[in-house]
Amino acid sequence: MAKEVRFSEDARTRMQAGIDKLADAVKTTIGPKGRNVVLEQSYGTPTITNDGVTIAKAVELDDHYENMGAKLVTEAASKTNDVAGDGTTTATVLTQAIVNEGLKNVTAGANPVGIRSGIEKATAAAVAGLNKNSHEVEDSSSIQQIASISAANEEIGKLIADAMEKVGHDGVITIEESKGIETELDVVEGMQFDRGYMSQYFVTDNDKMETNLDNPYLLITDQKIGNIQDILPVLQSVVEQGRSLLIIADDITGEALPTLVLNKLRGTFNVAAVKAPGFGDRRKAQLQDIAILTGATVVTEDLGLQLKDVTIDQLGQANRVTITKDKTTIVEGKGDKTALADRIKSIRQEIDSTTSDFDREKLQERLAKLAGGVAVVRVGAATETELKEKKYRIEDALNATRAAVEEGFVAGGGTAFVNIIPEVKKVADSLQGDVATGARIVLRALEEPLRQIVENAGLEGSVIAQRAKSEKPEVGFNAATGEWVNMIDAGIVDPTKVTRSALQNAASVSAMILTTEAVVAELPKKDAPAAPNAGGMPGMM
């Protein structure tokens, strides 16, 4: 396929057009008075959302150069989402602001490499300022405030605060669709461990890259599975019952894994496989924990058990299993309750008797997994469209809350960025030439989230941003009520991790775009010429 190469200003201008198209769609959603965006689906009803990364991923532009620009902004949003779980719209707004201001200076003759250096120095100063102004999460009310702000819904905030109170800050919280219209919280027995699917072909939900197994059997073994014939008898038994199967094994090698994947893709049976958690003796203990939770027998040579002899009675069962690329969550294992209680009691006794801090920590992790349970938020809504939108909001709120527990929180509504402007200005004033220009670009960009929040509320962003700079620290503009308040006292807060990640990723992607000197793209396909008109056929006798 032939390629086209564009250079310098021409290349950057085309990419900038794509950045603006994507960012203009995403930034309408920021703040308490942000709007929704409707996304067309290849089938079914459109999705309505205000989730920045979902909108960004849905944008595909016809022009190759514009599309590359849009995809680079999507990268900033996605990275922020991966690290902090929220803040994708903020990352997009900051990226657009830095790129647009930076391109003006590059076009005017500034050196992009110097500008990049200034952006990096100013970002480092801004991050230090955010960390200095951060407050620790101390109680359930802080959690509720953060979740409420992220979801723009007080009921959702209360729900997530309740869930965290019941299973702990590090507890497992999953989000499922309810059959009714009410959104409820339920705490069930379950556990999570740090192992993901062995192959992405096991994925059942391509949007979230998750594998969901309803009412599955579980085959648990500390052995390697290298030959599909070893597990064929038990596979056939599972297929006959029309159930799905989760295999937890030391490893699946040789032709066994491709055979499982092929049969999954053909629809012969629904299967997924993950590696066993832990190592050595701890692996054996964790496998036994999972077995007791689900009512399985661990297939191990220590007990003289072979894979080829496994029967369906030795498999575990659960109500639901969710697997991502790095975690597996088992919800409502169907094991014996008495055996589970005995196992928990045994682990507690080991914790009391051990003299090793490391062993105690690992035992406490196992205890939390077994005894803590899983909080299930069942999302209800009147329509499919509302259900999806609500689910996105709850996921964002949960991610934001976890981020706040991890690194604390800062004043929300764009106020945290305005509060660190004096510190970043000190750095900018100490620099020279194009490096100083780069730092001042970040200075101006720090006002942009507040401006956009205010403009989405129908007010003049520049006027509010100017006043915000002269206010006391943590005093900001509440766009929901139109009042100036202490943002911390009013419960308008953002997780430090989300705010920091949004700025760092925006600065990183923007610096790459500004230092781009050539862009290579495929030439647009030319339509084949229409067939010539053959004219009329001669008459027939």
UniProtKB/Swiss-Prot annotation:
Forms a cylinder of 14 subunits composed of two heptameric rings stacked back-to-back. Interacts with the co-chaperonin GroES. It is found in: Cytoplasm. The keyword Manganese does not apply. It comes from Oenococcus oeni (strain ATCC BAA-331 / PSU-1). GO terms for cellular component: cytoplasm. Belongs to the chaperonin (HSP60) family. Keywords: ATP-binding, Chaperone, Cytoplasm, Isomerase, Nucleotide-binding. ATP binds at residues 29-32, 86-90, 413, 478-480, 494. One of its GO terms (biological process) is protein refolding. SUPFAM superfamilies: GroEL apical domain-like, GroEL equatorial domain-like. Its EC number is 5.6.1.7. NCBIfam families: GroEL (TIGR02348), PRK00013.1 (NF000592), PRK12849.1 (NF009487), PRK12850.1 (NF009488), PRK12851.1 (NF009489). GO terms for molecular function: ATP binding; ATP-dependent protein folding chaperone; isomerase activity; unfolded protein binding. Together with its co-chaperonin GroES, plays an essential role in assisting protein folding. The GroEL-GroES system forms a nano-cage that allows encapsulation of the non-native substrate proteins and provides a physical environment optimized to promote and accelerate protein folding. It catalyses: ATP + H2O + a folded polypeptide = ADP + phosphate + an unfolded polypeptide. PROSITE patterns: CHAPERONINS_CPN60. This is Chaperonin GroEL. Disulfide bonds: none annotated. InterPro entries: Chaperonin_Cpn60_CS, Cpn60/GroEL, Cpn60/GroEL/TCP-1, GroEL-like_apical_dom_sf, GROEL-like_equatorial_sf, TCP-1-like_intermed_sf. The keyword S-adenosyl-L-methionine does not apply.
